[in-house]
Regions:
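Conserved catalytic cores of phosphodiester-cleaving nucleases, focusing on short active-site segments
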Residues: 46-48, 52-66, 84
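Nucleic-acid nuclease catalytic cores
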Residues: 85-128
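Charged, low-complexity C-terminal accessory regions
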Residues: 121-148
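Active-site-adjacent loop/helix micro-motif of nuclease/hydrolase catalytic cores
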Residues: 64-77, 102-106
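Histidine-anchored nucleotide/phosphate-binding helix
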Residues: 78-86
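Acidic-basic catalytic patches of nuclease active cores, encompassing PD-(D/E)XK
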Residues: 1-40, 49-52
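Structural signal for conserved beta-strand scaffold positions within catalytic alpha/beta enzyme cores
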Residues: 35, 58, 94, 122-124, ...
Length: 148
């Protein structure tokens, strides 16, 4: 799965960059996309709908804090996402950039069954403005193939 991850070409891949990549890419792929969607427990960064499938997406990005900040942002994103998991008919995802710090953070979850158990997808934004999706069942293989 490593072929999908591309090195970032941005100096700092901010949350707004991740959201921008996903909005453009999802729309190009035929998804209906809304941002800042009000839910029962706050706002989701993005909602995407296509062919009867609905995703609620919480996006996180980099700041100048390096690995520690990426780890904190990722964990905060997971908490926000879990608080918004109120509709069993929707799919839920955390989005982040394919930067070394975020990939390294993800490696801490290699032995965790949480993504599969909670059915959480990964939406990963690349520096070339492309994106890809990792389904919950494929996350361990993705982590294993993207060692930093």
């Amino acid at each position: 799965m490593r072929k999908n991850r591309k090195e970032s070409t941005l100096d700092i891949f901010k949350e707004s960059d991740v959201i921008g990549v996903l909005k453009r890419g999802l729309k190009q792929d035929g998804w209906s996309v809304k941002d800042q969607v009000k839910l029962a427990n706050g706002y989701a960064d993005l909602a995407a709908d296509k062919d009867g499938i609905s995703f609620i997406i919480e996006a996180k990005g980099e700041d100048k804090g390096g690995f520690s900040a990426a780890e904190m942002n990722f964990q905060m994103g997971l908490g926000q996402l879990m608080a918004r998991m109120t509709d069993i008919d929707k799919k839920y995802a955390i989005a982040f950039p394919s930067t070394p710090d975020f990939i390294k953070v993800l490696q801490k979850y290699e032995a965790s069954f949480a993504f599969k158990g909670l059915d959480i997808y990964l939406f990963i934004a690349n520096g070339d403005r492309s994106y890809f999706v990792v389904p919950p069942k494929d996350i361990p293989a993705f982590i294993d193939g993207n060692r930093i």
